Amino acid sequence: MEATTQVTRPQPKEGTLVHFEIPATDPAKISSFYSQLFGWKFNKWEGAATQNATQKSSMDYWLISHKDATSPDDTIGGLYKRNTPQEQFLNYMLVKSVDDSLAKATDLGAKVLMAKQEIPNMGWFAVLADPDGNTFALYQSKAGM
């Protein structure tokens, strides 16, 4: 019998990139591209339909895992069908409080593009543009930091 070792990753620090999203005109083509380039794994997330049911829309969403991921919950990002040509790669930064970080960011010149929203059973996020127009997201985990 082989002994197994469970690897525990340290909790990321505030401001760490913890998630990214890739909008794709052709999700199958783009998932194939990144699978071949980096070995990433793409798994359809059924939770996206549940989340978006409350928002009166539907969304096909694939969770992205590193090629060496040992659990389907060990994700690094997501892929979805692009809705508008303006949608671009979006990075999510971990924060202790979306509300506090939104206030600070707007004081520093950021523009709120999407107000704070809940991701059921996971946390909250908001999307902003920095003073130069670069889009990014804040993410607060329900599990805390």
Where are these regions (language model features)?
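Short, charged/polar, Gly/Pro-enriched secondary-structure boundary elements
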Residues: 70-75, 132-136
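Short acidic/glycine-enriched loop/turn segments that link adjacent beta-strands
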Residues: 50-51, 55-60, 85-87, 119-124
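Short hydrophobic/aromatic beta-strand element in the GNAT-like acyltransferase core
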Residues: 61, 76, 125-127
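Active-site beta-strand termini and strand-to-loop segments that position acidic
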Residues: 64-69, 128-131, 141
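N-terminal beta-strand motif that seeds the catalytic metal site of vicinal oxygen chelate
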Residues: 1-31, 41, 88-91, 141-145
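Vicinal oxygen chelate
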Residues: 25-28, 91-135
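Residue-level hotspots at or immediately adjacent to binding/recognition sites across diverse folds
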Residues: 19, 48, 55, 78-80, ...
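Core segments of cupin and vicinal oxygen chelate
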Residues: 11-14, 21-72, 107
